[in-house]
């Protein structure tokens, strides 16, 4: 049998997820501005929900863009 590879959580268990922490939130969005899925980031279900809510709040407050610009 193959051993399953253990994913390291990018966020600590007790780390606070806040909409004002833009550097942390940018780790969980693509270049186009889409929220990365949980299977790609390795976070828990609760953390994914908190991240999605924080990213959406940051977008509404114009801290993060809804879509990325197409600058060449």
Swiss-Prot record:
Q: Would you tell me the Gene Ontology cellular component terms?
A: chloroplast; mitochondrial small ribosomal subunit
Transmembrane in keyword set: no
Give the UniProt subcellular location, in the record's own words.
Plastid, Chloroplast
Spell out the molecular function terms from Gene Ontology: small ribosomal subunit rRNA binding; structural constituent of ribosome
Q: Which UniProt keywords apply?
A: Chloroplast, Plastid, Ribonucleoprotein, Ribosomal protein, RNA-binding, rRNA-binding
Keyword Metal-binding included in the entry's annotation: no
- What's a GO biological-process term for it? translation
Gene3D superfamilies annotated for this entry?
Ribosomal protein S18
Enumerate the InterPro entries for this protein: Ribosomal_bS18 (IPR001648), Ribosomal_bS18_CS (IPR018275), Ribosomal_bS18_sf (IPR036870)
> What SUPFAM superfamilies does the record point to?
Ribosomal protein S18
Instruction: Say which family it is in.
Output: Belongs to the bacterial ribosomal protein bS18 family.
Listed under subunit, the entry gives:
Part of the 30S ribosomal subunit.
Q: What PANTHER family does the database record attribute to this sequence?
A: 30S RIBOSOMAL PROTEIN S18, SMALL RIBOSOMAL SUBUNIT PROTEIN BS18M
**NCBIfam families (alphabetical):** S18
HAMAP family found in the cross-reference section: Ribosomal_bS18 (MF_00270)
Q: What is this protein called?
A: Small ribosomal subunit protein bS18c
- Protein's organism: Thalassiosira pseudonana
